[in-house]
């Protein structure tokens, strides 16, 4: 009997030891990522950033492993993620495309991370540019953290301005400066155009105006600031005399200005990619023009990451989310191996990043001071469920209104009624 107890004890102890020994490897987190750049530019280093972050994370937390499915392209990522969600197999932590955030938040796919941010002593929202952090909010709660951001700048065709005997504007230029130069360019030659791809929403941002309320229940097209912004866009559009400027004309060097993201600038300004695009003329970038030196902003695009609301390991998932979006080493590698910039103020303003950008841009007007200024006052797209539909409705009607002989103010009021009806259906 005693021998039986001894053998049984050994077996139980062995099983217990095996369970304990294996415990550190029992938690596996799945990460959802896509290959390449989020910004539509060439990039082959996206996994280098992720793999480095995972390696550091697993060293910090030896009881947790991280896996991800490679080879998913950005164009396929939304479908891949939605299929996972439908099957109840969504990753614990995953990237969120800008167009998907409102939907994922509204259907409850993302975990509310307010309490994690509040109670984590190693985390502070003050570390982020507030404008970029806001990209992850929905209904006044935080559902995602910014992983990488991409502010909008203004492309300037320096060669064309020189041909027209126009001086390069400064970074503190205004909408009046922008319009004046576009007008001079259009008058100098019938083959030249002042701008390409500058939209009514760019003008809204430049005036610091608000098209919708935060809840997404009201549209403000008839408010004075919005009307001034749209009227400026209408006046600017009239310079083209009905001609729709094309991307081909822009790439041939026939256009003075066009909004351009930092990612495109960082990709095509330095060698070797410089010879692939915009190589037939000299160009640079400036801050987007605003209504005045103290008023207005520009759009910033943000790649977000969030936690699944159904994750069985939310504490570990939060730590992984922090490793990707809040760890300074990871964030520094994003600026090094990707084309956007870190949403963390300390990283974006670090000497390492300053030196990196100086090496890339040379004698350009782009500087960390300019980027810091752009990010401090940047604006994200609105975060409510019907935003995309409401914006499409305005887009569709805006060009018709601009070219119509109908009363412009009455047309705006009528469009506002239509949008408000849609928002409250």
Predicted segments with their positions:
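Extracytoplasmic/periplasmic solute-binding protein
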Residues: 139-147, 152, 176-219, 225-226, ...
């Amino acid at each position: 009997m005693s021998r039986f107890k001894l053998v049984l004890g050994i077996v139980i102890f062995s099983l217990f030891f095996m369970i304990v020994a294996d415990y550190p490897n029992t938690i596996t987190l799945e990460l959802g990522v896509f290959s390449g750049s989020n910004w539509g530019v060439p990039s082959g280093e996206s996994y280098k950033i992720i793999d480095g972050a995972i390696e550091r994370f697993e060293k910090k937390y030896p009881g947790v492993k991280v896996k991800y499915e490679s080879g998913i392209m950005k164009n396929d990522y939304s479908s891949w993620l939605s299929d996972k969600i439908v099957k109840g197999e969504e990753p614990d932590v995953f990237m969120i495309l800008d167009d998907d955030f409102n939907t994922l938040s509204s259907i409850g796919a993302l975990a509310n991370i307010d309490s994690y941010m509040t109670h984590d002593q190693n985390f502070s929202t003050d570390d982020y540019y507030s404008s970029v952090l806001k990209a992850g909010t929905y209904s006044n709660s935080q559902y995602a953290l910014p992983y990488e951001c991409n502010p909008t700048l203004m492309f300037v065709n320096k060669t064309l301005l020189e041909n027209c005997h126009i001086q390069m504007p400064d970074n503190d230029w205004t909408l009046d400066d922008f319009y004046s130069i576009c007008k001079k360019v259009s008058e100098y030659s019938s083959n030249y155009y002042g701008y390409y791809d500058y939209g009514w929403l760019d003008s809204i941002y430049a005036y610091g105006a608000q098209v919708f309320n935060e809840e997404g229940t009201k549209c403000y097209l008839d408010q004075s600031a919005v009307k001034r912004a749209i009227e400026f866009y209408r006046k600017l559009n009239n310079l083209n005399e009905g001609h729709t400027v094309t991307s081909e004309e822009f790439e041939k060097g026939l256009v003075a200005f066009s909004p351009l993201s930092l990612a495109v600038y960082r990709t095509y300004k330095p060698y070797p990619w410089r010879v692939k695009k915009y190589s037939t003329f000299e160009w640079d970038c400036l801050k987007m023009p605003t209504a005045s030196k103290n008023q207005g902003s520009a759009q910033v695009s943000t790649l977000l990451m969030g936690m699944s609301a159904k994750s069985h390991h939310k504490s570990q998932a939060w730590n992984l989310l922090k490793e990707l979006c809040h760890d300074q080493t990871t964030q520094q590698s994003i600026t090094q191996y990707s084309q956007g910039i870190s949403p963390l103020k300390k990283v974006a303003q670090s000497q390492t990043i300053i030196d990196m950008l100086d090496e890339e841009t040379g004698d350009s007007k782009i500087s960390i001071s300019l980027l810091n200024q752009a990010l401090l006052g940047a604006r994200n797209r609105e975060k409510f469920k019907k935003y995309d539909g409401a914006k499409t409705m305005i887009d569709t009607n805006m060009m018709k209104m601009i070219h119509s002989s109908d009363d412009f103010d009455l047309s705006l009021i009528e469009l506002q009624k239509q949008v408000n009806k849609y928002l409250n259906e």
